[in-house]
From Swiss-Prot:
Organism: Homo sapiens
Compositional bias (Basic and acidic residues): 163-176, 183-214, 221-233
Keyword Coiled coil: yes
Domain of life, per lineage: Eukaryota
UniProt biased composition (Basic residues): 151-162
Protein known as: Lysine-rich coiled-coil protein 1
Length: 259
């Protein structure tokens, strides 16, 4: 029997077609593939306990009725296991534990003997379920990769957004530093100017004082010279007057006194 492969536009269409085909064959496929994967591992003996009964029913549908009838010893397990369970467990938990243990014993008995060959429909169902599960896993992994890529892109965008703000803050800090430096330089310049002004004022005052002193000295010298000249003139006049009197006196003395 040849199977023609169909092409589908999307994964959802392929899944719906697969479900229709399996229902037409009398099978009920499960669409929750992650749970199916756990059930498959449990049937292969990777897990020691089974938490619910639907997996047992699904496995029961996959195996032919002859395989279940050929292992009657597995039916006597619940009574022996139930006697071994502790008395403090609740009724519901003990029932679940009993079902899980009986199912594990059943699967061990089934797979310890000669393996039962599956027919074509069962093999196709298992392969198809694993193929669909693989596609679902790829679909979810691609979604996860796109979400991580979007998150990383968002982080990069936020970092880029943060960088201009940091640049603005840095520029504002640099401006404030520059203003402070400029104000300090201006203060220093004002101080230097005031010091220079005071120095120049002092120098000007000293120069003025020195010039006045020189002027006073010159004036004093000129006065001294004038006074000396006048004194000389006076003394000269006095001398001249003294000499004239003496001659008169001499004549007077000669005439009267007879000297």
């Amino acid at each position: 029997m040849k199977h023609s492969k169909k092409t589908y536009d999307s994964f959802q269409d392929e899944l719906e077609d697969y479900i229709k085909v399996q229902k037409a064959r009398g099978l009920e496929p499960k669409t929750c593939f992650r749970k199916m994967k756990g059930d498959y591992l449990e049937t292969c003996g990777y897990k020691g306990e089974v938490n619910s009964r639907p997996t047992y029913r699904m496995f029961d549908q996959r195996l032919p009725s002859e395989t279940i009838q050929t292992y009657p010893r597995s039916c006597n397990i619940p009574q022996t296991v139930e006697n071994r369970l502790p008395q403090w467990l609740p009724a519901h938990d003990s029932r679940l534990r009993l079902d899980s243990l009986s199912y594990c014993q059943f699967t061990r008995d089934c797979f310890s003997e000669k393996p039962v060959p599956l027919n074509f429909n069962q093999q196709e169902y298992i392969c198809g379920s694993h193929g669909v599960e693989h596609r679902v896993y790829k679909h979810f992994s691609s979604d996860n990769s796109t979400s991580t890529h979007q998150a990383s892109h968002k982080q990069i965008h936020q970092k880029r957004k943060r960088h201009p703000e940091e640049g603005r803050e840095k520029s504002e800090e640099e401006r404030s530093k520059h203003k402070r430096k400029k104000s300090c330089e201006e203060i220093d310049l004002d101080k230097h100017k005031s010091i220079q002004r005071k120095k120049t004022e002092v120098e000007i005052e000293t120069v003025h004082v020195s010039t006045e002193k020189l002027k006073n000295r010159k004036e004093k010298k000129s006065r001294d010279v004038v006074s000396k000249k006048e004194e000389r003139k006076r003394t000269k006049k006095k001398k001249e007057q003294g000499q004239e009197r003496t001659e008169e006196e001499m004549l007077w003395d000669q005439s009267i006194l007879g000297f």
